[in-house]
Amino acid sequence: MNQLESLKQFTTIVADSGDIELIRHYTPQDTTTNPSLILKATSLSYYQNMLEDVLAYARKQSGNHNAKMRAASDKLAVNIGLEILKIIPGRISTEIDARFSFNSDMCINHAHKIVSLYQEQGINKSRVLIKLASTWEGIKAAEELEKAGINCNLTLIFSFAQARACAEANVYLISPFVGRIYDWYNQRKLLTEDSYDREDPGVKSVHKIYDYYKQHRYQTIVMGASFRKIDQILALAGCDYLTISPVLLEKLRSSYQHVERQLFPATKFFHKPIPLSESQFRWEHNQDAMAVDQLADGIRKFALDQYNIEKILAKKL
């Protein structure tokens, strides 16, 4: 049995890709997308006919050129999601515009728009996860969306405060970014040569979150994300979900080395603490320099990719 199949015994595998052929090849349960992946997908030949359909849809919408451009962007993300849903049994994660990350109302409104576009094509909201950045405003938006029956994937998790606030908001799933945590420490030469497996700071972060969730009986799913190497993935065998890029999925599929479970259900349980207030959340998150840097950087990068998607669409409208 290869490592990918072995890993599936302990963990739900999710593909981090917008490439239909690669997703079909690796048979994941779910798939995650983001503006970076959508931008990359616009250059794939598979999606060229879809682009024409998206532009035709946008031209029929009311409003000025900018409104039509935003409509095209939403429709593109949803249409890519629709194609992916044809070949996976589970859910697609579609991301809210990162520029709304500090406005709960705009996050909520955009989420309802995305869900409506899926529903217009016959897709039940139970097959869609709305991705939001894990700012305080994003978490509060997710809390309201969950109450409305719209499940959310809270992304760009770098601090324990973010993870705790998400659990306390009863969000469906969180995505701690293992590789980007590792990158921050590595770029500052804060790691030794043997900082791997459980000593990897990104891996350690997910272990801490996973154990805390299970010990306090939170139902929020932990999905490790943003991996840089196979060792990070194998060190999280047993995590609820792992979302993995096609390059690393192929490495797992090609290896037949033994996979040993590293994360286990809790054996000790504790009462849930009083939920964090906004000021407590902001203070605790602020105390983690890596998390502050990486959350801000992640939002900026996703916003830039969203802008570039709109730029491509605007030229064609």
Curated annotation (Swiss-Prot):
Name by which UniProt lists this protein: Transaldolase
GO BP terms in the entry: carbohydrate metabolic process; pentose-phosphate shunt
Pfam families for the chain: TAL_FSA
Family membership: Belongs to the transaldolase family. Type 1 subfamily.
PROSITE patterns in the record: TRANSALDOLASE_2
Metabolic or biological pathway: Carbohydrate degradation; pentose phosphate pathway; D-glyceraldehyde 3-phosphate and beta-D-fructose 6-phosphate from D-ribose 5-phosphate and D-xylulose 5-phosphate (non-oxidative stage): step 2/3
Annotated Gene3D superfamilies: Aldolase class I
Lineage: Bacteria, Pseudomonadati, Pseudomonadota, Gammaproteobacteria, Candidatus Palibaumannia
E.C. designation(s): 2.2.1.2
HAMAP family: Transaldolase_1
Enzyme class (EC, first level): transferase
Entry-linked PANTHER family: TRANSALDOLASE (PTHR10683), TRANSALDOLASE A (PTHR10683:SF16)
Subunit comment: Homodimer.
Function as written in the Swiss-Prot or TrEMBL entry: Transaldolase is important for the balance of metabolites in the pentose-phosphate pathway.
Active site: K131
Main location: cytoplasm
Molecular function as annotated in GO: transaldolase activity
InterPro entries tied to this protein: Aldolase_TIM, TAL/FSA, Transaldolase_1, Transaldolase_AS
GO CC terms, sorted: cytosol
CDD domains found in the cross-reference section: Transaldolase_TalAB (cd00957)
Keywords: Cytoplasm, Pentose shunt, Schiff base, Transferase
Subcellular location: Cytoplasm
Catalyzed chemical reaction(s): D-sedoheptulose 7-phosphate + D-glyceraldehyde 3-phosphate = D-erythrose 4-phosphate + beta-D-fructose 6-phosphate
